[in-house]
Amino acid sequence: MSQSYINVIGAGLAGSEAAYQIAERGIPVKLYEMRGVKSTPQHKTDNFAELVCSNSLRGDALTNAVGLLKEEMRRLGSVILESAEATRVPAGGALAVDRDGFSQMVTEKVVNHPLIEVVRDEITELPTDVITVVATGPLTSDALAEKIHALNDGDGFYFYDAAAPIIDVNTIDMSKVYLKSRYDKGEAAYLNAPMTKQEFMDFHEALVNAEEAPLNSFEKEKYFEGCMPIEVMAKRGIKTMLYGPMKPVGLEYPDDYTGPRDGEFKTPYAVVQLRQDNAAGSLYNIVGFQTHLKWGEQKRVFQMIPSLENAEFVRYGVMHRNSYMDSPNLLEQTYRSKKQPNLFFAGQMTGVEGYVESAASGLVAGINAARLFKEESEAIFPDTTAIGSLAHYITHADSKHFQPMNVNFGIIKELEGERIRDKKARYEKIAERALADLEEFLTV
């Protein structure tokens, strides 16, 4: 295949990472991004790698699978992780970022790379004669989505994804919250709004009866479990939220707390957490409260949360339809297309779920696109690593039951020998092996 550059379509997390990895290997890149010419309902800016849901890249410890994935990506020179570290905001044991500062930094690093040419245009056809990484995301334009679905004989998959509301910090009643991270991990980074049992029962009643924004009548309500609307969770049972985003465990009242509580209990019945959303600390999001309620209903119901009685919503929660591919049938473990070998796919459209996972897929696709360009052998990362196990999972899962997947220790190859019963010790050993295997892989 004779060509002088590689195409990357889409400048989200995956596309930005792929373009950067290719350029860092000395190959010119044409990076196409339609925003600036054609917008989407979910994006608010024209910047690259815009975070449209949460501002959290989740746990940072190596005993957390996504923490391991991030460490692997750091060692691979990820532009997404470098930008995230530079724009991080307090979030206890998690890596959260100033969402605007983060996307601005990614944009600057990519746009200013001497080997990356940014083209603001919509692509409606899949190239057939140029090595191309397609990373158009779950919000791929209709015209291009049709071409991608055609690779799968016209059968496309979808699920619904949702974002949580964002609050002006000056409208939060600070007398009703306390600063703490769960189990006191890391710095005290979350504002915690405790609820008594009666407050929770009243809130649950209002939530399950609130009016949702309509979906298209011909589409079933299919949600990704990791980003489920809070009202859907509430309808699964009155205690479901107490084991999810409103879990009180590890968030005991501080000694100086004087607000309402149930008797002498040291832990609230339920807790709503608010997390800093920007570096200035002027915005907070409601953790785990992705929603598809009508905006007026969001205001009515969420103002029942103690401290948010007079909250001003800078952004209401929204939901959007995400499309993804039948990756077990369509992709190699390098994210290369089985049917059209000049194409690589990356990002959430491949069935990886999450910001970090999307960027990781772009990293692998970019590396392999560069290797194909140079006529080098493909790079299949070990399935003992988080980044390799993710690629292995989406390309080896049962196609009939394939659904988007976050990275987790369950998809990483088990340790050899007798099973370590202590979970933390087992995860530490898996992480230790993963990083050792990655280093060995990179030296071959």
Swiss-Prot record:
The keyword NAD applies. The keyword NAD applies. It holds the Pfam family GIDA. GO terms for molecular function: flavin adenine dinucleotide binding; tRNA (uracil(54)-C5)-methyltransferase activity, 5,10-methylenetetrahydrofolate-dependent. Keywords: Cytoplasm, FAD, Flavoprotein, Methyltransferase, NAD, NADP, Transferase, tRNA processing. GO terms for biological process: tRNA methylation; tRNA wobble uridine modification. Coiled coil: none annotated. One of its GO terms (cellular component) is cytosol. FAD binds at G10, A11, G12, L13, A14, G15. It is found in: Cytoplasm. It catalyses: uridine(54) in tRNA + (6R)-5,10-methylene-5,6,7,8-tetrahydrofolate + NADH + H(+) = 5-methyluridine(54) in tRNA + (6S)-5,6,7,8-tetrahydrofolate + NAD(+); uridine(54) in tRNA + (6R)-5,10-methylene-5,6,7,8-tetrahydrofolate + NADPH + H(+) = 5-methyluridine(54) in tRNA + (6S)-5,6,7,8-tetrahydrofolate + NADP(+). Its main location: cytoplasm. Signal peptide: none annotated. Its EC number is 2.1.1.74. InterPro entries: FAD/NAD-bd_sf, MnmG-rel, MnmG-rel_CS, MnmG_N, TrmFO. Catalyzes the folate-dependent formation of 5-methyl-uridine at position 54 (M-5-U54) in all tRNAs. This is Methylenetetrahydrofolate--tRNA-(uracil-5-)-methyltransferase TrmFO. It comes from Streptococcus pneumoniae (strain Taiwan19F-14).
